[in-house]
Amino acid sequence: MLCTSHIYECIENGSGLFQHGHTYLGHPVAAAAANAVIKKLINNDLVTRSAEKGKKLSNMLESKFSQHPNVGDIRGRGLFQGIEFVEDRETKKSLDPDLKFATKLKMNAFEAGLICYPMSGTRDGKNGDHVLLAPPFIIEDTQLDELVEKLDTAITATLGKYV
């Protein structure tokens, strides 16, 4: 139980018993933590900041990767951005699942110093590859540049050089 020393002393000097329950124990603490996060988001205008930085990140991704022959789509909202990888950009045919693209991209991204979320099975549970990017709300412009460069390094290492 979390409480102030004053509350604890009242219980201790009373019956010594604190009988309570919830259908989902621990929820008050989780709710208090969530409330603190919401206050931080509002007081520091982080939602607006996320939208602004997200637009910048989206533009950077479009500029860097939109003409890549293996990029089928780039989209997102705020700082939550995704890139779909395909065998052919025009037909949007998925990469062969046997290539294990997401696994290789994750390894290459990690080696480049980038933590991201590549996954396969985007289309039907087996076919389709993508990477999700979700940098923190407090990311700076220089770090956005670094993120895109590291992602480019990882994609190039995974798929090979492109023009």
Model-derived segments and their meaning:
Residues 1-163:
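Conserved N-terminal phosphate-binding loop of PLP-dependent enzymes in the Aspartate aminotransferase
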